[in-house]
A protein has these predicted regions:
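A Zn2+-metalloprotease active-site environment signal
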Residues: 1-262
Length: 262
């Protein structure tokens, strides 16, 4: 309900190709995240993720994922995403925050502050009923609370690491995450960049991502290997025809025609 209300208030992108691109990348990352959860026996959490994707027409450099897998991408961040892998960096990072329930942590902290230090049970790792209560209370403070509250450096570090794995599993080269965050670092503290105000992007962060890449790359290599195995199986005979028409078949056909004429 909160997601629907927020999205309803914002202008949507009217560029079909832009929306299609974002949704395709979001879907692949969401599928990878769901697959990861199921493989690690986190089926309950996987079922809680009711994925939805929205592209907001706004010049601000921003993106976020609300609890339950509601992904919002601002058009202002797309110029920084020259490749789909760079866009996947953004999406997987935000999805990781949702999977790790970081928003619930910051919501409970903010509610506790707003209520003057009153005791509040943390939503993290607790029942869905408590989680829902926390979210509802937070939205009672204003629809911008979840969007504007900053993550801690620890949460950012976790989202960076988990995000690299998710994008790699989705078939996007995690090495391109470095190029994206370098662009973000060059953005500086401009007023149009909301993402930078909550996502520290500095040399230390980029260095940490580089150090974690060796752990994420095997997931990407596994994806590529699986694609090579699956491609010949699906098209079977058509696949052979396509390979033949690339180089060898054309030459063979010409040589046959010449031989028959002679």
């Amino acid at each position: 309900a909160q997601y629907t209300e927020y999205v309803r208030q914002m202008p949507h992108s009217d560029d079909p190709k832009q929306v299609e691109r974002v949704r395709e990348v979001c879907q692949r990352v969401a599928d990878a995240a769901t697959s990861y959860l199921r493989k690690n026996n986190l089926n309950d959490l996987a079922q809680q993720m009711k994925w939805e994707f929205t592209v907001i027409a706004d010049r601000r450099v921003n993106a976020f994922c609300m609890p339950g897998g509601k992904i919002v991408i601002y058009t202002g961040i797309l110029p920084l995403c020259a490749t789909d892998a760079e866009l996947a960096t953004v999406v997987s990072h935000e999805v990781s925050h949702a999977i790790a329930r970081h928003s619930n942590e910051r919501l409970s902290t903010e509610i506790l502050r707003q209520m003057g230090g009153r005791v509040l049970v943390s939503a993290v790792g607790s029942t869905s009923a408590i989680t829902n209560t926390v979210i509802q209370q937070a939205y009672g403070l204003g629809s911008q609370v979840l969007v504007s509250l900053p993550y801690s450096r620890k949460q950012e570090h976790e989202a960076d690491q988990i995000g690299l794995v998710f994008m790699a599993m989705a078939g996007y080269n995690p090495e391109q995450a470095i190029s994206f965050w370098k662009k973000m670092a060059q953005q500086g503290g401009g007023s149009t960049s909301e993402l930078l105000s909550t996502h520290p992007s500095d040399a230390n962060r980029i260095k940490a991502i580089g150090e974690y890449l060796p752990k994420a790359l095997p997931y990407y290599q596994e994806y590529l290997a699986q694609q090579k195995v699956e491609q010949p199986k699906t098209p079977s005979t058509p696949a052979k025809d396509k390979k033949d028409t690339n180089r060898k078949p054309t030459n063979k056909k010409k040589s046959k025609k010449k031989s028959t004429k002679k």
